Amino acid sequence: FRNYLSACLNKDFVHFDLSLQPEILKECLVPENYPDGCWPSPHTASLMQQFAVNTVSKELSGEKQEGIFSVNGPPGTGKTTLLRDIIAAILVKRAKKMVNFTEPAKAFRKIGEVQVSEKYTPSIYEPDSSICDGGIVVASSNNGAVENISKELPLKKEARGYSDQVGYFRQVSEECVGEESWGLIAA
């Protein structure tokens, strides 16, 4: 938030106009700047969508892992498509860190217990901090749009043709969503 206000109030802050400075666009779109993953889709991102995905991915990969990004546009212009690719990039980045654990259970640490009844006291675990980075918040003045994204993206139909090959906490996701899903990505 501080960065946003600083940019708005600081007259010395440099704003880029990509139509006047296409070299910025070209630099961002070299293959080395693409994230390691994208959403399984028969369609590729448009030029400006890919620029946005690469920019957000780079910012979220930085040391501070912070930034405010605005995506505006009328319905049907690819905002959800853009968000899908950003989510895919985050998931792949986490997966690359998760393979470093010798077994899945080592990615979690017991932090407590909750006594639900006399005979049932489940444990509470927290994930290792190395797999918790890159979180995003999706906000909109249209709460229905955000709710739709949160409910739709985990569904199997959203991973067209790949839903049997991909899984991200699938069992937990199906318990939360109440129907077949490929992964848990929104809360």
Segments and roles (model prediction):
Residues 1-187:
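Helicase P-loop NTPase motor core of nucleic-acid translocases
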